[in-house]
């Protein structure tokens, strides 16, 4: 089976493990975009420790779950968003103000919509979590 969108696959694996009440999830296959997205989730307290395991076939991430994710998912298609439009996308994907984050890929790296608003930069929407 060919997986076309590794980020979507990883986020759905996390969502399914949270629903089942698991304490950790193994994400495979992986890439740098998945790692940077997981780091954003870790910075905001949605996931715990992230451990990389090199198995000789591309590697795996073992992610500790904290049980704080109500919903997580990819944003497809990956919409380009300007700095001034971030609030509109917040209203579309997040349940309320100050609840959850949007993950945005910018020219300065992968970050949350909160950081992007502080730095006044836009980017491409990758995922939402709350």
From Swiss-Prot:
GO terms for biological process: translation. GO terms for molecular function: rRNA binding; structural constituent of ribosome. The keyword Transport does not apply. Signal peptide: none annotated. Pfam families: Ribosomal_S8. Keywords: Ribonucleoprotein, Ribosomal protein, RNA-binding, rRNA-binding. Gene3D superfamilies: 3.30.1370.30, 3.30.1490.10. PROSITE patterns: RIBOSOMAL_S8 (PS00053). GO terms for cellular component: ribonucleoprotein complex; ribosome. It comes from the Archaea. Part of the 30S ribosomal subunit. Belongs to the universal ribosomal protein uS8 family. One of the primary rRNA binding proteins, it binds directly to 16S rRNA central domain where it helps coordinate assembly of the platform of the 30S subunit. This is Small ribosomal subunit protein uS8. It comes from Pyrobaculum islandicum (strain DSM 4184 / JCM 9189 / GEO3). The lineage of its organism: Archaea, Thermoproteota, Thermoprotei, Thermoproteales, Thermoproteaceae.
